[in-house]
Regions:
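N-terminal, charged/glycine-rich beta-strand/loop interface patches
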Residues: 3, 8, 12-14, 18-136, ...
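Leucine-biased recognition of intrinsically disordered, low-complexity hydrophobic segments
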Residues: 19, 193, 204-206
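Broad gene-expression machinery/nucleic-acid interaction feature
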Residues: 29-33, 67-68, 84-86, 116-118, ...
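Long, compositionally biased low-complexity repeat segments characteristic
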Residues: 189-195
Length: 330
């Protein structure tokens, strides 16, 4: 039987990752790994590896903040059933990394197997991570399962944005995917806090007993969101957001600032929602863990983008006195 191999190498420390699989297996097994360190005034990529369908691009520097702007590139155009892709990143002390994608994450129709994406992010002491990919678009009949796990060291901060479309809205394809399962878990260095899963509202109504079974008990000092959507078989799983086309979550978590900063940011974000009645509907809450969570639904992609960019700008200014960057997507 023929075998196939994918290779990729990094800038910085040379590293080659080889992926070997039987062609008879369904889907691709792709891994993307990054390691960042602070050197002088900049964050630099010191080690990386990737395997198909991921493609490696070195970070860019769009301003003088020293932030390493890192693009997650899948040139194949999306995920199909049976794909299992992963992203792992380690940020050492005092680094600042922004990870994004050049276009939407498309998930294509599948007859049986889901497309799976697993993300594991480790943020070192006093480091900053912004995980801000473009929206996920599940096509009609698609199956998608995603998990994002973040570990925060003392003084670390994460901005985590996760948005999903109801489908290919321009083609009048709405809530026609087979299933979407999502799990986000952010573990902080704080101890002695009550489990905060109850403080983080699940974005869509779930039928009793229909939440994903893979999630472990919530550790103390953690923020967890889990949901499962099955629009065709369980229409009630979509809940009240069925009349909207975009659903998004934003988590801003970290112990580098005090409670008064989070309260001020909560008020600023609430004011942004008040300026867009009818176009978006959202809420913001502080948590048992240090930080806040934002939930929102939007009528259109432009409404989602404008609101997200306004919130992102407010968060960056309040936390770091930095403007929102121009990511120059083409």
């Amino acid at each position: 039987m023929k075998r196939k191999t994918a290779e990729c190498f990094s800038s910085g420390t040379f590293h080659v990752s080889r992926l070997t699989s039987h062609e008879s297996l369904v889907g691709r097994r792709g891994a993307l790994n990054y390691e960042f360190e602070r050197q002088g005034s900049r964050t630099v990529l010191t080690r990386s590896s990737c395997s198909s369908p991921w493609h490696h691009f070195p970070p860019s520097y769009l301003d003088d903040s020293g932030c390493a702007y890192t693009w997650l590139v899948n040139p194949s155009g999306g995920l199909v059933g049976g794909d299992h892709v992963s992203v792992e990143a380690q940020l050492h002390a005092h680094t600042h990394v922004l990870m994004t994608s050049p276009s939407a994450n498309r998930v294509y129709r599948s007859l049986s197997e889901p497309a799976v994406q697993e993300v594991r992010l480790s943020v070192g002491p006093d480091a900053r991570l912004e995980w801000v990919p473009e929206v996920t678009i599940p096509f009609a009949g698609s199956r998608f399962r995603q998990s994002i796990h973040v570990d925060l060291a003392p003084g670390a901060t994460v901005i985590l944005w996760d948005a999903i479309a109801s489908g290919r809205v321009a083609m009048r394809e709405r809530w026609a995917f087979a299933s979407v399962e999502n799990e986000i878990c952010i573990r902080t260095s704080s101890r002695g806090l009550a489990p905060s899963s109850a403080a983080v509202p699940v974005p869509l109504l779930l039928r009793r007993g229909q939440a994903p079974k893979r999630g472990a008990p919530v550790p103390s000092g953690s923020v967890v969101e889990r949901y499962r959507l099955v629009p065709g078989r369980l229409p009630e799983s979509v809940g009240l957001v069925g009349s909207w086309d975009y659903v998004a979550s934003l988590f801003v978590i970290g112990d580098a600032v005090g409670a008064e900063v989070w309260k001020g940011l909560e008020s600023a974000i609430a004011e942004i929602f008040e300026q867009r009645p009818g176009l978006v509907l959202g809420g913001v809450s502080t948590l048992a863990a240090p930080g806040l969570v934002v939930k929102l639904v939007a009528r259109s992609a432009p409404d989602l983008t404008v609101t997200w960019e306004a919130i992102w700008a407010a968060v960056r200014k309040e936390l770091w006195n930095l403007p929102a960057p121009n990511l120059r997507r083409y």
